[in-house]
From Swiss-Prot:
GO terms for cellular component: extracellular region. Residues 1-21 form the signal peptide. This is Probable rhamnogalacturonase B. One of its GO terms (molecular function) is rhamnogalacturonan alpha-L-rhamnopyranosyl-(1->4)-alpha-D-galactopyranosyluronide lyase activity. The lineage of its organism: Eukaryota, Fungi, Dikarya, Ascomycota, Pezizomycotina. Belongs to the glycosyl hydrolase 28 family. Residues 469-485 have a biased composition (Polar residues). Residues 502-516 have a biased composition (Basic residues). It comes from Neosartorya fischeri (strain ATCC 1020 / DSM 3700 / CBS 544.65 / FGSC A1164 / JCM 1740 / NRRL 181 / WB 181).
Length: 516
């Protein structure tokens, strides 16, 4: 019998019901990267790659994958690599891709620089937490070319993780998770240009856990698209970004059981937006909890008549069972754009919308408004009642700050954007993504350092022969070229004190994480 962590923990009363409903089962690869590497390691340098920032990495990467696709680890050592032809790595099983170098886009085709498809039991990571894809999108954007490639796309991938990776300046979207299942994405930094169409993370999949990710761009931060079910998004740092959202939503929308938790949004377009214009289908069972915002144009923005998208045939997307809880901070100008805007379709009004513990205040002026249309539930401008008929926009204006709106800021909040026509530097992955929240997993670079130190301590009590072998292992793990450090990889990482976590696969078995 297959058990799931959330089912067990919720029965024990250890996980809130909304969290238990977010994911439907375990996430992550079935086997560790170290086990994959032990079976076979395919170093791209052995297949013709050169870290000279000139030789095309595409063919060597494809060749290394072909050799390891049935089980093994494809290894890109530290160094600078050029990539002018894109790769589609399909039909792999029980394999991992370790990117410790920096891949620079040198080609101009559209599509996806790296696409993983029809794959199971997969892990993509950097053991140094500094591996990156540098899209150099500014080179195309300066010529008003916005049709360049995406950096990374996963399609039809199950039981996977992507972590400790940096994505920079994509010509188009940065990271798309398309029709995947049982996945985990974490410890990432994404930095794009200040222009629309340069999405951070887009996900339309089932049973996905995205956490501890920083995004800088002008469009989507971490956005759920249709169809999607059982998505948990938490500890997200939208650092001068477009902000998180759902949509754009069109015909036959099918989104349910979505949780956004611990979302920090700085100087962005919105804290959360659900956007549509016509269409059909449903969005249901959504929790938006623990949001902090500062300097954003919009805060909560549900707009079923969003004018920036062309109208879609249909009466509108039905929104129901949405909880907005514990929002704090400030918006840029509450008189121009109030912190609560819930505009629902007149033909299919929203219902069971709950707003509680919501305290935002304007940074400019001394008043703000709340606006609702055809929206039912509890809190602020929402109407109560079980008969959900349409009604015109109602707006409430207030001129005094709510109590408890003050909220912490992050020390790495950016003061300026990176434009879209100049080079964007490769950042480091932060170690904090939401005020007061400890990331679920330490960066792999820090884990490797701790492992090496522990190994060095153990050497002092080993026999001389064993100590010699241990020293060789430590030295090999610290090298940045020629050999991977598989002992630092794998689906099992440290558990922070004081919180519950979803279940990850552990060496082919389901492991139930219970916080100390």
């Amino acid at each position: 019998m297959r058990l799931h962590a959330f089912t067990l923990l919720s029965l024990l009363g250890l996980v809130p019901s909304f969290a238990a409903a977010s994911l439907s089962g375990s996430v992550g690869p079935l086997t560790s990267a170290s086990a994959k590497a032990a079976k076979k390691t395919c170093n791209v340098l052995d297949y013709g790659a050169k870290a000279d920032k000139k030789t095309d990495l595409g063919p060597p990467l494809a060749a290394a994958f072909a050799a390891c696709k049935s089980g093994g680890l494809v290894y890109i050592p530290a160094g600078n690599y050029a990539m002018s032809t894109w790769v589609k790595l399909a039909n792999g099983k029980a394999w991992a891709l370790q990117i410790d170098g920096v891949i620079y886009r040198t080609g101009t085709d559209g599509g996806n620089m790296i696409m993983i498809e029809h794959t199971s039991d997969f892990e993509l990571y950097s053991s140094t937490s500094s591996g990156a894809m540098q899209g150099l999108g500014y080179e195309l954007h300066a010529a008003n070319n916005w049709s360049g490639p995406r950096l990374l796309r996963l399609w039809d991938v199950s039981d996977f993780s992507v972590h400790d990776l940096i994505l920079v300046d994509s010509p188009s979207f940065h990271f798309s998770i398309d029709t995947c299942s049982n996945g985990e994405v974490y410890n990432m930094a994404i930095r794009g240009g200040n222009h629309g169409g340069l999405d951070g993370v887009d996900v339309w999949s089932t049973n996905i856990w995205i956490h501890d990710v920083e995004v800088t761009n002008k469009d989507e931060c971490v956005t759920v698209k249709s169809p999607a079910k059982n998505i948990l998004v938490e500890n997200i740092y939208c650092n001068l970004s477009g902000g998180c959202g759902m949509g754009s939503l069109g015909a036959d929308t099918d989104i349910s059981d979505i949780t956004y938790k611990n979302i920090y949004t700085w100087n962005s377009n919105q804290m959360m937006m659900i956007k549509s214009n016509g269409g059909s289908g449903t969005v249901s069972n959504v929790v938006l909890e623990n949001f902090i915002g500062h300097g954003n144009a919009y805060s909560l923005d549900i707009d079923s008549y969003w004018s920036s998208m062309s109208a879609v045939s249909g009466d509108g997307v039905e929104l129901s069972n949405i909880t907005i809880k514990n929002w704090k901070g400030t918006e840029a100008n509450g008189a121009q754009r109030g912190p609560i805007k819930i505009i629902c379709p007149d033909k299919v009004p929203c219902y069971n919308i709950l707003i509680e513990d919501f305290a935002m205040w304007t940074e400019t002026g001394s008043k703000q408004w709340y606006s609702c249309q055809s929206a039912y539930g509890s809190g602020f401008c929402l109407k109560s009642g079980s008969h959900h008929t349409s009604y015109a926009v109602t707006t409430t204006t207030v001129s005094s700050a709510p109590s408890g709106y003050s909220a912490a800021k992050m020390p790495l909040d950016l003061s300026t954007d990176f434009g879209s026509t100049q080079s964007i530097p490769i950042p480091t992955i932060p170690t904090s993504f939401y005020p007061g929240a400890t990331p679920y997993s330490a960066l792999m670079s820090k884990q490797s350092t701790k492992a090496a130190k522990a190994r060095a301590v153990d050497m002092s009590v080993e026999t001389p022969a064993a100590a010699s072998r241990s020293e060789q292992v430590v030295q090999g793990a610290s090298q940045e070229t020629s050999q991977p450090a598989p002992e630092s990889a794998g689906p099992v990482r440290s558990v922070p004190t004081g919180g519950n976590r979803p279940s990850r696969h552990r060496h082919g078995h389901h492991h139930f994480w219970i916080a100390a």
